[in-house]
């Protein structure tokens, strides 16, 4: 069956002259209306000052003894990749060591490089001081102009230079990760048949250093009409394992445990996400799942020892059960805890889960509820510390250093206040829709406001 003619298909050529001209024409119409408004100039100046302010939180990712950050500003348009220590990061003005200057690299190579991330080989279990030299290499990804396809190159952070003769992938929609210092799991374009019809990797290869990529062992091949295939290694000390994922569509996948030359399929719903936490298999459901005489609801988070699951047992511990007012927003993992970010009537709550011999304990973390909370582990394999980002209607974004097992946390960074919030207050209220459904909402107002029904109110949602 032939597809119907799409008269607007030319707009999909995002860099095409016709598409860019069309965008310029539409932008001109919008800009003319915006710029004609009296409030435009002062508002534009104010927003530009906020966006370009140096008072931004430099979020970091830890590797070995250093905390890395990618930073852009008016002096570094493409950006610099830099690092510092925790002691320095605690200071108002940390001392940063530049690891890579992307503006200089783009200029020297004549390329329109856009940063697409760094991937380190995780530290082994021994002390950082002894292990750092073994994990000073990382895989850097760059795109040309910000596209989906990237170039991957091995980089030495100690020498601050690309590794001569190191791992390198030409521009493609690639998926790559470490097995060990000399071995990668790679999905990329190696010629005809290596990519799916969607343009993503169809094959996963195990690539040894110093060998041709096209000769690398094929670990898995997806179907041509699948979305993609990928693989990764779990580096949790004592629970190292490898998984292969067959992505059937954006919201459906199959997961396989790699055991030597064998791929053992994880018997989960295609719509569910699954990952391991030490020896536990954790499954997040996107649809109801009936198994062994019990139905688990959409949105539930389940756990069971992986070894027991592979033996056919299905008596899951329910780590989270949704309700009409309660949903799971995010999951983060530290060395010994799972941190769930829950939404209860659209208010945030962080719940800390710890497991011992298959039994899970639950503790609600004391954190602000009427705002946005974001949790990111500092070192998911080696530490119970985590970063907690907090902001609400009246509080500028603040970054804390917390630790599983305690509510004590250290304020690391905070943005400056852009208005005086001392006279304001925030509360959560509930209204009822016509069918009786409760609708939670937040109310921001002056502390001295009289609730007599006569106050002008700005409603949005």
Language model segments and positions:
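Zn2+-dependent metallopeptidase catalytic domains
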Residues: 1-27, 59
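Multi-bladed beta-propeller domains
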Residues: 3, 9-14, 32-54, 88-114, ...
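Conserved beta-propeller blade repeats
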Residues: 53-70, 109-141, 168-185, 222-245, ...
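Structural motif
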Residues: 75-82, 147-153, 193-206, 241, ...
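Serine-hydrolase catalytic core recognition
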Residues: 131, 369-461
């Amino acid at each position: 069956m032939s597809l119907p003619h799409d008269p607007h298909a030319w707009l999909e050529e995002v860099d095409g002259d016709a598409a860019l001209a069309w965008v310029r024409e539409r932008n001109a119409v919008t800009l003319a209306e915006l710029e004609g408004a009296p409030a435009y100039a002062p508002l534009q100046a104010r927003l530009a000052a906020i966006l370009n302010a140096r008072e931004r939180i430099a979020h970091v990712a830890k590797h070995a003894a250093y905390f890395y950050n990618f930073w852009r500003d008016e002096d570094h348009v493409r950006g610099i990749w830099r690092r510092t220590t925790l002691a320095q990061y605690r200071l108002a003005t940390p001392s940063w060591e530049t690891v890579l200057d992307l503006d200089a690299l783009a200029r020297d190579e004549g390329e329109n490089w856009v940063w697409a991330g760094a991937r380190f080989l995780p530290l082994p279990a021994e002390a950082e001081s002894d292990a750092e030299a073994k994990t000073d290499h990382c895989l850097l990804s760059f795109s040309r102009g910000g596209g989906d396809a990237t170039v991957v190159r091995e980089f030495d952070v100690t020498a601050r230079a690309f590794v001569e003769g190191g791992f390198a992938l030409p521009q493609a929609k690639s998926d790559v990760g470490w097995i060990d210092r000399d071995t990668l799991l790679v999905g990329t374009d190696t010629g005809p048949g290596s990519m799916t019809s969607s343009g993503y990797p169809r094959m996963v290869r195990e690539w040894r250093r110093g060998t041709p990529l096209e000769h690398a062992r094929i670990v898995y091949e997806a179907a041509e009409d699948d979305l993609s295939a990928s693989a990764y290694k779990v580096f949790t000390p004592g629970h190292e394992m490898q998984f292969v994922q067959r992505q059937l569509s954006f919201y459906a996948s199959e997961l396989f445990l790699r055991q030597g030359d064998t791929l053992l399929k994880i018997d989960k719903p295609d719509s569910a996400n699954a990952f391991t936490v030490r020896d536990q298999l954790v499954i997040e459901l996107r649809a109801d799942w009936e198994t062994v005489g019990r139905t688990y609801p959409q949105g539930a988070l389940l756990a069971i020892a992986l070894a027991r699951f592979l033996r056919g047992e299905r008596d899951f511990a329910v780590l989270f059960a949704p309700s009409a007012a309660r949903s799971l927003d995010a999951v983060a993992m530290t060395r010994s805890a799972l941190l769930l970010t829950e939404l209860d009537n659209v208010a945030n709550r962080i719940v800390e889960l710890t497991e011992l011999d298959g039994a899970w304990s639950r503790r609600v973390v004391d954190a602000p509820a009427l705002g946005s909370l974001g949790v990111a582990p500092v070192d998911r394999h080696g530490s119970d510390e985590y970063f907690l980002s907090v902001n609400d209607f009246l509080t500028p974004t603040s970054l804390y250093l917390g630790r599983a097992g305690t509510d004590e946390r250290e304020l690391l960074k905070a943005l400056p206040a852009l208005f005086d919030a001392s006279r304001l207050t925030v509360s959560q209220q509930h209204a009822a829709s016509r069918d009786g459904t409760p609708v939670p909402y937040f109310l921001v107002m002056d502390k001295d406001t009289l609730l007599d029904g006569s106050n002008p109110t700005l409603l949005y949602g």
